[in-house]
Amino acid sequence: FRNIGALDIDNLKGVVFFTGENGSGKTNILESISIASQLKSFRNADDRDMIQWDEKDFFISVTDENRNTYEVGFSSDEEKVRKKTKMNGNQIAKASEYYSRLLTVFYGPEDNRLVTGTHEERRKYIDSVIAKTSSEYIRLLNDFRKILTSRNALLKEIRENRKKDSELDIWDSLFSDRASKIMEKRRAAMEFFSVHFRSSYERISEMNEIPDIRYLPNMQECDSRAIAGKIERGRKKDIAFGSSLQGPHRDRYCFM
């Protein structure tokens, strides 16, 4: 894995510091933990880049304080990188079923963009936080992304007179169903998170200001029927732009 051929670290308790020369692999150790936790790098690195250039695979095993063991293996062939996961020796076939088992939080300088960055960056980060505690939310997001991609492709074909408007009916129904459930999950998460956000800020700040983080959904409608109605009313504009202009993919989060 990266520049680490083999490494065993035992009995990590309390606050732990990794020290060493630049380029010695300190961050790579943290990255390996993120792989074991969420099956991807917190650096957003390509899967192939993490495999040593003269190797075809790597293996990571982490045991938590409850003695649960999580094992992740990445193997590369000419087509793609394949991932295998196990918990306590039992193979887990779906990534969505593994994802929320070993919970970790990574914070680095680039995470300041949660405040200074775009709405898309905040939305992506908060989605990842919710997903760590809800495998259902992972499935909803994956479904919605596929539906959104298919709907946008169809919108472009309708604009070019290669498809009929009526073909949107099935996609709009699926879109509205997943959208309402995603928005419900996000609202519930923000209600829970905002309370802890304010209390945590008060403990570290000597200022009297009370900050908040707010969820600003792109659509005020909550149930799938109301969302479907709004989506249908916006069809002409969506077709003209060749893109879905409304939905949870355009939700915003703001720090106040």
What role is predicted for each listed range?
Residues 1-21, 35, 159-256:
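Conserved NTPase motor "head" modules and their coupling/switch loops across ABC/AAA+ ATPases, GTPases
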Residues 13, 24, 28, 45, ...:
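Generic alpha-helix structural propensity
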Residues 13-49, 133:
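Phosphate-binding glycine-rich loops of NTP-binding sites
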Residues 32-33, 103-106, 172:
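Short hydrophobic/aromatic segments of transmembrane alpha-helices and their interfaces
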Residues 37-121, 125-137, 194-202, 224, ...:
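Nucleotide-state sensing region of NTPase/ATPase domains
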Residues 53, 144-147, 186:
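Intracellular alpha-helical coupling/juxtamembrane segments of multi-pass membrane proteins
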Residues 113, 120-169, 173:
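Long, charged N-terminal accessory/stalk domains
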